């Protein structure tokens, strides 16, 4: 079970790195996958903000995991669960959202909460 949580966390971090890099390098396809469409007029500021946020978060998760700082990773995941919660509400509030675009955000919330609680519960205070 311990390995399952480890690899789920690693996959989560690596996916965030991928999503962040995609928002930085390919903003429009990333926006579509996120679940909204905005008229940017060539201004990709939102995309770059989201991209660096996800890239940074993914890198930190991977670093904490590889450094075996599981308790810190747990707190990061719990606190970070607010990000997919807000992303979910942003997509849902968009007038022409597709239900299928909500699932990745909902899954991310569940993963953050389960993984975060697991690491906090199974690691001792230092």
Q: Where do the model's predicted regions map?
A:
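Cytosolic juxtamembrane helix and N-cap/initiation of the first transmembrane helix
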Residues: 1-15
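Membrane-interfacial loop-to-transmembrane-helix junctions in polytopic alpha-helical membrane proteins
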Residues: 1-4, 42-45, 65-72, 96-100
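Hydrophobic transmembrane helix segments
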Residues: 15-46, 51
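Aromatic-anchored segments of alpha-helical transmembrane domains
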Residues: 18-19, 81-89
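Core segments of alpha-helical transmembrane spans in multipass integral membrane proteins
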Residues: 44-65, 79-82
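Membrane-helix boundary connector in multi-pass membrane proteins
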Residues: 67, 86-103, 122
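Membrane-interfacial loop-to-transmembrane alpha-helix junctions, especially the N-terminal start
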Residues: 71-79
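Membrane-water interface at the C-terminal end of transmembrane alpha helices
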Residues: 110-126
């Amino acid at each position: 079970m311990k390995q399952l949580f480890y690899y789920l966390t690693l996959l989560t971090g690596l996916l965030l790195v991928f999503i962040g890099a995609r928002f930085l390098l390919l903003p429009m396809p990333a926006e579509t996958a996120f679940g909204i469409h905005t008229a940017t007029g060539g201004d990709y500021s939102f995309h770059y903000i989201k991209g660096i946020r996800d890239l940074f978060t993914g890198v930190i998760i991977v670093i904490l995991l590889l450094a075996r700082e599981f308790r810190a990773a747990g707190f990061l995941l719990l606190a970070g669960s607010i990000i997919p919660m807000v992303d979910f509400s942003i997509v849902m509030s968009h007038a022409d959202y597709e239900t299928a675009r909500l699932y990745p955000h909902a899954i991310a919330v569940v993963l953050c909460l389960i993984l975060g609680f697991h690491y906090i519960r199974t690691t001792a205070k230092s």
